[in-house]
Amino acid sequence: MKFKDKIAVVTGAGGTLCSEIAINLAKEGAKVFLIGRTEEKLKKVYDTIRSFGGDAVVYPCDVTDKDAIAVLGNEVEKVGGCDFLINGAGGNNAKAMPTITKFDPRELSGELEEGAKGLYDIDMDAFRSVLDINIMGTVIPTMEFAKQMVKKGGGSVINFASMNSYCPLTRCFAYAMSKAAISNLTQSFAAYYAPANIRINAIAPGFMVNERSKAYLGTVEEGLTKRGEQVIGHTPMGRFGQANDLTGCVKWLLDEQNSSFVTGITVPVDGGFLTLGGV
């Protein structure tokens, strides 16, 4: 087992992508702390891990709450301290997104068609919440668990960036800018923590299959939405990503034997989406 006796903290562990990562780390022998807001989802992941004899702890927690993360840190330190941190918590908010893709002067006078929403109509509290969960939800856990990694002589952090880090998608203003920040933060923190032998990298998933994506993209098997057709047409590999497409990259970045000289990078896992200019 590659990660036997290692302790991993996985935030967003109740989601489709990070649950798969957590399960794979447990299969490799790591003790995994499952962090997220919804205890029911975390328990399902826990049950899967326990079904094959893996070791996991369910810990509902808000990653943007510094005090709550400090309490979590104490619990992790009691069993040996964190070796790996996966900052997978994050997301978007429909209230932070317009429904139109280009400025329309009518949005300034409230005269858009019924149901249409421009940039000036978005909910700023929702906008801030997206920045908070994606940026501070990465900064706070990293600073907490890096302290434990220092004591252990090193460790590895993997952040969740996005293809939006490089090229923003339409309507995703808050999400795109926050994910661009994650790529920059990954570089900044990698340089800062390098003297402590803490490596910090990021993965940038492309369009991945989960329950949320099925609603607005559809599926290749059951039929695509218009936006789904655009995505597949722009993805050289001709499909959406699956959660298990991420696990190999994650395990490589965590593995000290294979990536000990790798830090500060963001790895696209997107089926080639970013290789095309769109024309």
Positions of PLM-derived features:
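Conserved glycine-rich cofactor-binding loop
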Residues: G14-T16
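Catalytic Tyr-X3-Lys loop
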Residues: K102-I140, I158, I182, M237
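Short, flexible catalytic-loop segment of classical short-chain dehydrogenase/reductase
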Residues: Y166, A204-Y216
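Residue(s) in the substrate-gating loop at a strand-loop-helix junction
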Residues: S162
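Conserved glycine-rich Rossmann-like NAD(P)H-binding loop of the short-chain dehydrogenase/reductase
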Residues: A30-K44
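Active-site helix of classical SDR
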Residues: T142, S178
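Short, small/polar-rich loop/turn modules that mediate ligand/substrate recognition or access, typified
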Residues: A194, R199, F261-T263
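C-terminal substrate-recognition "lid" of short-chain dehydrogenase/reductases
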Residues: K2, R239-V269, L274
